[in-house]
Amino acid sequence: ECLLSGTTCMNIGPGEVMQGLHSDDGLVTVPRPRMPFMVTTIWAFTDFTDENGATRVVPGSHKFDHEPDYSKQYDHIAAEMPAGSVMIINGGTWHSGGANSSEDDWRLGLSVQYCQGWMRQQQNQYYAIKPEDMREMPPRLAQLCGYTLYRGIMGHIDGASPGGFIGADAVDETAYSRIRATAD
């Protein structure tokens, strides 16, 4: 079970410098290396090329015992991919937006992060999306935004699922309860 943690649109224009390497789970206080607490997806809306700032990735960095030191340089690769592609990485993987050395080629992408169902999300989805708008969304989106219980109890409001407060009956069934039902 996971939650939608955050979304970020990234637009890297000509002349922009490389972003500092970072991990998306850098605020997690559990020592590294650690189990995956987050998953990051990076969607390419335009072609990602070495020249226009394709995302830089340090392969295997999710296994390192430290966060990147911004004063140091690290070997990295450019995650080149055509528009319409998606890259999926462990949230502990060091990555950054690359430098755009092109004359007129903008690199546009979307980063969507997911976290463990018991974690606090980066963006507060309860306030980011109005309840009346959430009522119109598919039940799975309501689940991803946190309008459900984690393992049947976490996230309750007076013992009830938060889905009831947006009139979403379908969000009450969690993956945990489905697994438990098939095990019995």
Q: What are these regions, as identified by a protein language model?
A:
Residues 7-10, 92-94:
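Generic short beta-strand segments
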